[in-house]
Amino acid sequence: LLLAIDTATKMAGIALYDQDGLRVEEMWWSNANHTVELMPRIVRACEQQGIAATTLTGVSVSIGPGSFTGLRVGLSVAKGLALVLHIPVIGVPTLDAAAYAHKRSTLPVCAVLPAGRGRWCAAFYQTDADSWQRCSDYTLIRT
């Protein structure tokens, strides 16, 4: 059972996955309230699914680009759960996660996230016959 955490942007989210796929997903607008909102939502999602935290087998967490404070909150919760439950934690680049939602696209995908101060982070992705992959470096664009 995998817990996924994304607190990189103001649109935060969590999800629980098992061998059968997505069990529960919740996304919410978090206006700099990640610290207060994240753990109660994880607890509620587990309770709604009848899942004890001790049954988690791994945690994935967004690692940026994104809000420094938001990333710290997500990484701290992920690392804390991993240490207490003795489970692995894996970091997932935020742009990769955003683009992955479009992995079936036959056209190239450009994932873009605001980086603050008039800057944007971007990367290009494409699907070929066998795989989906990033086909550019992560780029910081100044406007």
Label every PLM stretch briefly.
Residues 42, 77-81, 98-102:
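Buried hydrophobic packing segments
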Residues 60-89:
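DPxDG-like acidic metal-binding loop motif
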Residues 29-37, 68, 72, 76, ...:
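Residues at secondary-structure transition points
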Residues 47-54, 83-94:
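Phosphate-handling active-site elements
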Residues 15-17, 73, 124-125:
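Short amphipathic alpha-helical segments
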Residues 1-63:
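N-terminal beta-alpha supersecondary unit
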Residues 21, 33, 88-143:
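Surface "functional belts" at beta-alpha junctions
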